[in-house]
Design a protein with these regions (language model features):
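Conserved motor-coupling elements within RecA-like helicase/translocase cores
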Residues: 122-139
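SF2 helicase catalytic motif II
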Residues: 144-148, 153-197
Length: 205
């Protein structure tokens, strides 16, 4: 319904369907907190999502992010990374990558409405080079790897950073896990990232 009303890009009606991989595609009905998150993001306002396990927290940020990506690519097809999602553990990034792949189910190779890649230190040199050469719309990483990307002087990392210029979304999943010194480190990283990427309109979630 949101796509029909023009709130979301029309492609989102097909992307965000339940049961796609089981051949039982059905409309996805959003919870109130997901609708509120969408409204905030579309106004370029940062926000925090606090909700129970299994209540669709990830969709609270991925729906507005992917909607923005699809709309932006229609106007400017140049490849760049528009969103970085930081996870406290690689296992969470791996799991999220699998979930996002489900939303791409049914799209022919090379015709996916958005692209996503993991850059957590688990990747081979060839995989890192592919990310640098062919930047994903969404980059899944951890804060230590993001720190390395910003401080190392390897050509691959420089390319990744260059493709993130003007970053639009930065998500800190499981925000409550960053406490004490680590919390201070992450806060500083966010400030440095905003400055380095010239992300003046950055939405933090």
């Amino acid at each position: 319904q949101l796509a029909k009303d023009g709130v979301l890009h029309t492609d989102c009606a097909h992307i965000f369907q339940a049961g796609k991989t089981e051949g039982k595609a059905a409309d996805l009905h959003l919870y109130v907190h997901q609708l509120q998150s969408l409204a905030k993001a579309q106004k370029h306002q940062s926000f925090v999502v606090t909700t129970g396990t299994g209540s669709g927290k990830s969709l609270s940020f991925f729906i507005p992010i992917i909607d923005r990506i699809v709309k932006a690519k229609a106007a400017d097809p140049q490849k760049r990374t528009r969103a970085i999602v930081i996870y406290p553990m690689n296992a969470l990034a791996n799991s999220q990558l699998e979930e996002l792949d489900k939303f791409l189910h049914g799209y022919p190779a090379g015709e996916a409405p958005f692209t996503v890649a993991r850059y957590t230190g688990q990747e081979s040199a060839a995989e890192r080079q592919e990310i640098a050469s062919n930047p994903p719309d969404i980059l899944l990483t951890n804060f230590m790897m993001l720190e390395l990307i910003l401080t190392r002087f390897e050509d691959v990392d420089r390319q990744v950073v260059e493709h993130c210029q003007g970053l639009e979304f930065l998500v800190l999943d499981e925000l409550h896990t960053y406490r004490g010194r680590q919390g201070a480190d992450v806060a500083l990283l966010v400030r440095r990232l905003r400055e380095r990427l010239k992300a003046d309109q950055l939405v933090c979630i």
